C-alpha cells in the first residue's frame, strides 16, 4: 500500500480526492491536512462532508512547514489541492523528502518562470522543480508522467479544451491563421468552497467572466502550441463543464480525417467517450470521471463539444489517473 497524504483536504476537490484515495486498493490515506490556522483543523472530515460518514472519518490535521519532514516519514505520495502560492511554497519541501507530488494548483503547469509573474502575480522561485514538472494531461503525457516526481494536474477548462483540440493540432488540421474559439460554462463549484457573493444561491447567474484575461487561456495556448480565444462562463448549476469550440480547418480536410484523428487519439483511452454526431451533456458526465466529446463539420468549419465534471475529470479524477499511470496501476482504478 502506498501511503498518501492530501493537503488542502477540505475544498470540493479535496473531498473528491479523499474519497478516491480511500477507494483505491493500492493506496492508504495516511493524512488529511489543512493550513495550520484553518478553522477546520481538528474536525472529523465527515463532519464537513456528510456523504462520506463511515467512509472518510479521519481527523483533519493542521500543516506547519516545520512539520513537513516529520509527516513525510514513510509517505509515498503527496497530493496538493492548495492555492497556487501555497503549492509553490511547499511542493519542493515535499519533493526533498522523497515523495511523489501531484499538484492540482497552477503553480507548476507551465515551465516558464515569467509566466507566473505575468498571469499569477507572483515570482516563481523554484526553477529546478518547474523544469522537472510534467503537465499531467493524462491521455497525452503517460510516458512522461510515469517517470516524473512532480506532476502538475491541468486545470478544468484546459482539460475540457485541450483534449478536444490536441488531436486536430497533432495532425495539422487547424488552419494556422485562425484561432480556435472556446466558449465554456462551468458550475459554481469551480469557484471553490469559500463564501462569495457572486456564487451565492440568489446571486449566481449565467454570465461570462475573465474575458481575454483568464489565466487558463495562456495555459491552453501553451500546451496546444496554437493561440486560442477562450471565454469562460459561470453557470447557475453546481458542477460540470460544457465547452463549445469553433475551429477553422485547413482547406480540404475531410470529415473522415477529423474522425480518424479523434479515434487514433482516444480509441484505447477508457476515460474518453467519443460521441460523433451526438451532443454531450453535463448530465451525462456529472459525478463521473469521463470526458465526452463530439464534433460536427461543415466545410472548413468544425464545431467540437466536450463535457466533463469539473471536480472530477477536471481535477480529482485526472489526478487519480496520473497516480495510476505513475505507479503502474490500471487507468480506471478507483474511478469506475
From Swiss-Prot:
The keyword Membrane does not apply. One of its GO terms (biological process) is L-arginine biosynthetic process. The active site is at 156. Keywords: Amino-acid biosynthesis, Arginine biosynthesis, Cytoplasm, NADP, Oxidoreductase. It is an enzyme of class 1 (oxidoreductase). Its EC number is 1.2.1.38. It is found in: Cytoplasm. GO terms for cellular component: cytoplasm. Pathway: Amino-acid biosynthesis; L-arginine biosynthesis; N(2)-acetyl-L-ornithine from L-glutamate: step 3/4. One of its GO terms (molecular function) is NAD binding. It catalyses: N-acetyl-L-glutamate 5-semialdehyde + phosphate + NADP(+) = N-acetyl-L-glutamyl 5-phosphate + NADPH + H(+). Disulfide bonds: none annotated. Belongs to the NAGSA dehydrogenase family. Type 1 subfamily. This is N-acetyl-gamma-glutamyl-phosphate reductase.
